[in-house]
Every structure is written in C-alpha cells, then in structure tokens.
Amino acid sequence: MKIDMHCHVKEGSIDSRVGIEEYITILKEHGFQGMVITDHDTYNGYRYWKKNLKGKKHTDFVVLKGIEYDTRDAGHILVIMPEGVKMRLLEMRGMPLALLIDLVHRNGGVLGPAHPCGEKYMSFTHARRYYLSPEIVKRFDFIETFNCCEPKDSN
C-alpha cells in the first residue's frame, strides 16, 4: 500500500492551502491508497475527516491519525497513533524527545523524525538531542526519507 506519511490539510493547518478532499483526489491520481494527516500540534484536520467524510466519501482510501509534534529538543517528529487513543497532550508542543517516545510507544503509537536533515531549527539532525545522544535514533520506528518541501541534498 502506497501511503503519504506527512500531510497537512487546510482544515487543520496553516501550512496547507489544500483541503482534505482535494488532497485525497490528488494522491489517488498519483497512485496512493492512503495518507497520514500530520498537522502541526493538532488533530483538527483528522477530526474534520472523521466527522465529515469518514465512511461517507473516499471509502477506498485510508486516512490515518497523525500529528507533527514540535519537541523541545529534537525538532519536528511525526507521530501516528491508533484510532481509539485520545492524547490531548500531543497537541501541546514542547515535550522532550525521550518523554515523547515513551508516551507514544506506551500507547501503541509509532514515531519518527520529519525532514530529519532539513531546516536547521526544525530537523532532528540539527537538534541538541541528536548531538547529545545520537543513539536515540534507534528508538524511532521510521525515518522520513523524502520531503518535497526540502532541498534535494536534504532528502
């Protein structure tokens, strides 16, 4: 299954001018069968999907609940949580990475760095946590290897 793991939608993020229905249509045209909504520090985009579209439209397309979490010491981290798990704490930025990893794993979620080699202040490899303990990378479940908003040498 081909899934876009890092999606911002206008219903939940100022980082997007594309609504979720248009996004799904574009992804389908490019051969994707799913997406993870990962708006910054909010589940509002996913909530919109769940309330207005889930089970009504695009039933052949998988939409997963995610968030792009802004850590205190490790840049942006993509977090994917199971459908039934409610964690409002993830909508409050600033948790240290080690605590975030423990919290997500204890509640059945997975996580990994977003654009890990990209922008200086938002990327894991430029963050304090990586320099202090690079072995923490072993605790990630995945690593984003391509981000269309980053320059070629960052991917």
Residue ranges and their predicted role:
Residues 93-128:
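Internal catalytic-core helix/loop-beta-alpha segment
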Residues 118-119, 148-151:
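Short acidic, S/G/P-rich loop/turn micro-motifs used as interaction or catalytic elements
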Residues 81, 113-115, 147:
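Short, structured patches in soluble enzyme cores that scaffold and shape functional sites
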Residues 36-37, 112-113, 144:
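Conserved beta-strand positions in the central sheet of alpha/beta enzyme cores
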Residues 49-51, 76, 119-136, 155:
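Distinct, well-ordered alpha-helical segments
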Residues 1-106, 150-155:
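A metal-dependent hydrolase metal-coordination microenvironment
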Residues 109-110, 128-149:
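Catalytic pocket-lining loop regions of alpha/beta-barrel enzymes
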